Amino acid sequence: MEFKYLVFIVLCQYLDNTFFSETEAITTEQQSLSTLITPSLYVTTDSQNTAGNALSQTTRFKNISSGQQASPAQITPEQATPAVYVSSSPLTYNITRQAESAVNNSLPQTSPSGFTLTNQPSPSTYNSTGQPPKHLVYTSTQQPPSPAPTSSGKPEVESTHNQPTKSTPTIYLQRDTPPPPPPPLTSEPPSGKGTAHKNNHNAIAAILIGTIIISMLVAILMIILWKYLRKPVLNDQNWAGRSPFADGETPEMCMDNIRESEASTKRASVVSLMTWKPSKSTLLADDLEVKLFESSEHINDTSNLKTDNVEVQINGLSEDSADGSTVGTAVSSDDADLALPPPLLDLDENLPNKPTVTVVSPLPNDSINPQPSPDGLNQVCEEQHSKIQEPFPPPPDSFNVPLSAGDFINNQESAHEAQCQEFSTPDLHPDLTDSLPPPPTELL
């Protein structure tokens, strides 16, 4: 099937739609047919069903005078728009057999205007007459229909009714004036399973990374708080030890804190850092020296205690001699360098049996103090011996026999005296000087 028949069928369908319109629209459509038949046509088909869709698609052409523009036909956005281009240049065209079969199937259609295929005029051939096209029809998928002016000057609004499932071919007619710029097309992002899967994976990865970071921060905070609470801060005022200017002893709490701090710190000896280590012999020698030093200190302490006791005894004897209760022997200054007498024995055991004789070195103050007379000293000694040798009173014959008032008083007094003698401490200093010879007359 040739291309001219296809174009004729399209024009017939267009005329069918125009006959139902007003009379003014019919006159304008007839003029547009005369202008569209003169130039040569160039048709490009994108698929096998393009010709069939073109046969069933209704297209509205408008008669436009020279210098006027044609309004685009409205097409639904879901339909594909294969381009149909009309050129004035002589070109040779090859029609595929698929298009021919599609057109042959559409031949039984009849045109409502009464024209048949045999009545097609000859100017619709392949070769163009060389006349430049004067009009251009541009079909857009988004531009709304616009009113088309007629030769009488009255605009007419015409709309095309397209089938929602078929593609509409776009016909371009060249003209001298440049066409208006096409409107911007908004392309929707393709939505499919691939993009959905990618979005899901990205969201899952973001959630995992966020949970990991949050869990790490929480764990770090918990560790810091645990360490801070495990070691409470001690408000110790004596953290540096006992102050050298402090008066008195440190309290028990401070001492406990100091001991704990000392126990916690580990001290290393300097000997462990030395290359030379002391042997066992040197250690033993050091131990012996320490022991000898301690023993010498102990001996010195005991000797000092003995000398202190002797000095105390000498002072006591000098005081007693000043009171006239004791008799001391005067020793010349030549005998002052003699050794001290041996320590005194237990006086309690030897006192009643044998009086001890001691030689006491006189003090320098003793020579100044006057000595008591020997008669007075003898009387005092006799009184003390009589008191010590006095026997205890005999016990009563029987406790059942009642005693008289005088006997009872005497018994009480005797018991009281016995208890006093029993618990009283005897004066030892006079007993020590009982057997001493009288002092020389030079000192008197």
Curated annotation (Swiss-Prot):
Expressed in myeloid and lymphoid progenitors and increased in mature hematopoietic populations with the highest levels in granulocytes. Residues 1-23 form the signal peptide. It comes from the Eukaryota. Keywords: Glycoprotein, Membrane, Phosphoprotein, Proto-oncogene, Signal, Transmembrane, Transmembrane helix. It is found in: Membrane. The modification Phosphoserine is found at S269, S272, S279, S295. The keyword Calcium does not apply. InterPro entries: EVI2B (IPR033239). Residues 24-203 are extracellular. GO terms for cellular component: membrane. Residues 104-131, 160-171, 318-332, 361-370 have a biased composition (Polar residues). Residues 104-197, 318-337, 361-444 are annotated as: Disordered. The chain crosses the membrane at residues 204-224. It is a single-pass type I membrane protein. The modification Phosphothreonine is found at T250. Residues 177-187 have a biased composition (Pro residues). Required for granulocyte differentiation and functionality of hematopoietic progenitor cells through the control of cell cycle progression and survival of hematopoietic progenitor cells. This is Protein EVI2B. The lineage of its organism: Eukaryota, Metazoa, Chordata, Craniata, Vertebrata.
